[in-house]
Amino acid sequence: LFRSGTQFYSYLYVMDSVSGLLTVLLNGESGEAYNISDDASDIMLKDLAAIIADYAGKKVVFEIPDAVESAGYSKATKARLDSSKLNSLGWKAKYDIKTGIVRTMEMLKAIN
């Protein structure tokens, strides 16, 4: 990682993303915007990296760049989506973030 990994973002397993989109298409109101997200899957980047590294049997390495190099990286530290409108349509994620990552890694492993 090129920063401390404390950035906090909303991630979602693709199967949950698809079911969220279908929920909005079938039950949402035309012209309304919905965030396809799950509050329980909001995670710090360093924790996300740790889950992936643990699965791969690797260690997360932090390489903090100097000021000039870091100028090219995003300054965002938080990008969390509010899922309340989607939840009000009856949608709920079926996979937690760790399960989604492991399932993704298993699929990638199977095709390589």
Which residue stretches match the model-derived regions?
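Non-catalytic, hydrophobic alpha-helical segments
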Residues: 17, 21, 36, 45-48, ...
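Residue-level preference for well-ordered alpha-helical positions
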Residues: 53, 86-87
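Amphipathic terminal alpha-helices
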Residues: 97-112
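C-terminal "lid/loop" region of Rossmann-like NAD(P)-dependent oxidoreductases
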Residues: 4, 33-34, 46-49, 57-78
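Short, hydrophobic alpha-helical segments
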Residues: 25-29, 56, 108-112
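Residue-level signal for the nucleotide or nucleotide-sugar donor/cofactor binding architecture
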Residues: 9-15, 43, 81, 92-96
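Conserved small/polar residues in nucleotide/adenosyl-binding loops
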Residues: 1
